[in-house]
């Protein structure tokens, strides 16, 4: 390990380094400030609780306006009301987004378009948080990697026992190919010593996998300046060999509020590798992004990394964007564009609490091959959607007899959630994608959960319940849209029976069931693009 040899900064004279005492540093870091911690915990709770206006399935009225989820040509930031340290992956037709929950569970949003992602509800993907890693759950990142068990999804996140000194990076592995899991805990990941570490990420260079994170050069976090480290991996959760510090906060723009380098994440283009990291204190408006460039040679040699002397992404007062940082990168659906996801505040007085919102914008490339992130865009800016986004229409499906729509009952992201009817309010659990299976049948996929309309247990009986369940293509998830005059029956392939409202009820939250098909209005439906 060579912690003293860090990335070289070209044409950069010596700069005075701000030295903070341990106590002062501890008061500046993330959730150590009590107001920031309170805001953070409120944000976490808010992010995992359905707003009152959206709790129609629990029986409360909803004043929510109609949510358009068909693919749009443009969108505006932010993606949702809170979400620090965001990460997005695009895979097999869907965006998957994670952000800091502060406490478990870890959740993920899934949607086929950015417009739908903004409306999607968080789905819990991992809930095992014992006392040793119960708290300060930060910065989850999702990566698809080849490991000992084949290609799997891995989540890297930071957590501890409740003190900042206890923070470490932890790793989860999926049991299969679904980014939504389930996941198993693989353990902590750290270098040759078990010292403080946060914000873990991975990068593959010349066919070898490496782990990058924000760590410290001494055992006590409060006595050290968090820096960027890299180490080789034997598998996605096990390091091998010594670590190397490739960046420390030494430049004037890296020490505003607190000397800080954190949140390293790689972006690669035309055979070149860059690591973008966050610098200065997140409590203030001057949190920003810097860049390291891999110049070739030994990846674990600090001399192979060159730090850019100026920040590449920072506050934009004219646009009302402050403290932009802790980013990730993802590809557009067609793979032709690179995009950045980051968090930012809308006021210079906001800091590390629940005011940080996730935002995205397109990355371009400078003539020298380095990434050009531009300036953070105002929330009023119309941004063209990522290239290759599918045109996905979602429909509300209305019962002719009652005038109410098919609705996933609370908890509306859960497997086996019951399907009922409810007054139309435009929420995503009332909107359905009709997926043509090419055999005269369709699947109805919930915009909210990505799960499918399903006759429970492949039942062929009258009165069988209708639920949502992960889409698998079985005959109990296949329906015919059968014309009856100007309306339609929804006829289940498995049973040949039709969906209707139980007992002919006109009440909100009345459940759907299957019955022998009839032509009365209770068996008839219409659909309208939302």
Go through each PLM region and give its residues.
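N-terminal compositionally biased, intrinsically disordered segments and leader/signal-like regions
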Residues: 5-7, 19, 32, 47-50, ...
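N-terminal non-cleavable signal-anchor helices
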Residues: 10, 20, 34, 39, ...
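Intrinsically disordered, low-complexity repeat tracts enriched in Pro/Ser/Thr
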Residues: 11-14, 26, 62-66, 400, ...
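Carbohydrate-active catalytic/glycan-binding domains of CAZyme proteins
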Residues: 59, 65-392
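Lectin-like carbohydrate-binding module/patch detector with strong preference for beta-trefoil
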Residues: 390-530
């Amino acid at each position: 390990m060579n912690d003293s040899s860090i990335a070289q900064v070209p044409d950069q004279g010596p700069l005075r380094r701000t030295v903070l005492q341990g106590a002062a540093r501890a008061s500046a870091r993330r959730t150590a400030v009590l107001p920031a911690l309170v805001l953070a915990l409120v944000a976490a709770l808010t992010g995992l609780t359905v707003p009152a206006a959206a709790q129609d399935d629990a029986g409360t009225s909803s004043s929510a306006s109609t949510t358009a989820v068909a693919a749009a040509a443009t969108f505006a930031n932010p993606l949702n009301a809170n979400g620090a340290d965001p990460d997005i992956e695009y895979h097999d037709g869907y965006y998957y987004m994670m952000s800091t929950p502060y406490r478990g569970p870890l959740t993920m949003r899934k949607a086929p378009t950015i417009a739908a992602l903004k409306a999607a509800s968080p789905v819990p993907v991992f809930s095992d948080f014992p006392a040793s890693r119960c708290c300060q759950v930060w910065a989850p990142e999702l990566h698809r990697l080849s490991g000992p068990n084949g290609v799997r999804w891995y989540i890297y996140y930071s957590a501890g026992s409740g003190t900042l000194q206890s923070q470490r990076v932890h790793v989860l592995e999926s049991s299969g190919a679904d980014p939504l899991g389930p996941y198993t805990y693989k353990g902590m990941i750290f270098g040759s010593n078990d010292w403080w570490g946060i914000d873990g990420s991975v990068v593959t260079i010349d066919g070898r996998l490496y782990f990058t994170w924000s760590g410290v050069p001494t055992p006590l976090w409060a006595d050290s300046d968090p820096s960027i480290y890299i180490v080789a991996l034997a598998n996605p959760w096990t390091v091998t060999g010594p670590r190397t510090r490739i960046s420390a906060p030494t430049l004037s723009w890296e020490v505003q509020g607190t000397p800080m380098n954190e949140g390293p994440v790689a972006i690669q283009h035309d055979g070149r590798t860059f690591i973008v990291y966050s610098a200065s204190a997140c409590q203030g408006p001057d949190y920003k992004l810097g860049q390291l460039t891999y110049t070739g040679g030994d990846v674990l040699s600090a001399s192979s990394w060159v730090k850019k002397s100026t920040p590449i992404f920072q506050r934009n007062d004219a646009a009302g964007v402050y403290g932009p940082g802790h980013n990730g990168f993802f590809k557009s659906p067609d793979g032709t564009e690179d995009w950045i996801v980051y968090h930012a505040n809308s006021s210079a007085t906001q800091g590390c609490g629940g005011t940080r919102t996730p935002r995205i914008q397109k990355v371009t490339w400078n003539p020298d091959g380095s990434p050009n992130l531009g300036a953070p865009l105002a929330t009023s800016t119309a941004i063209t959607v990522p290239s290759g986004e599918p045109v996905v229409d979602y429909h509300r499906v209305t019962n002719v007899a009652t005038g109410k729509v098919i609705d996933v009952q609370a908890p509306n992201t859960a497997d086996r959630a019951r399907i009922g009817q409810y007054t139309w309010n435009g929420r995503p659990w009332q909107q359905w994608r009709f997926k043509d299976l090419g055999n005269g049948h369709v699947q109805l996929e919930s915009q909210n959960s990505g799960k499918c309309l399903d006759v429970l247990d492949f039942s062929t009986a009258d009165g069988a319940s209708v639920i949502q369940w992960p889409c698998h293509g079985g005959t109990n998830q296949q329906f015919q849209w059968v014309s009856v005059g100007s309306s339609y029956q929804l006829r289940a392939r498995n049973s040949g029976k039709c969906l209707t409202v139980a007992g002919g009820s006109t009440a909100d939250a009345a459940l759907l069931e299957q019955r022998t098909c009839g032509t009365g209005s209770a068996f008839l439906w219409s659909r309208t693009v939302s």
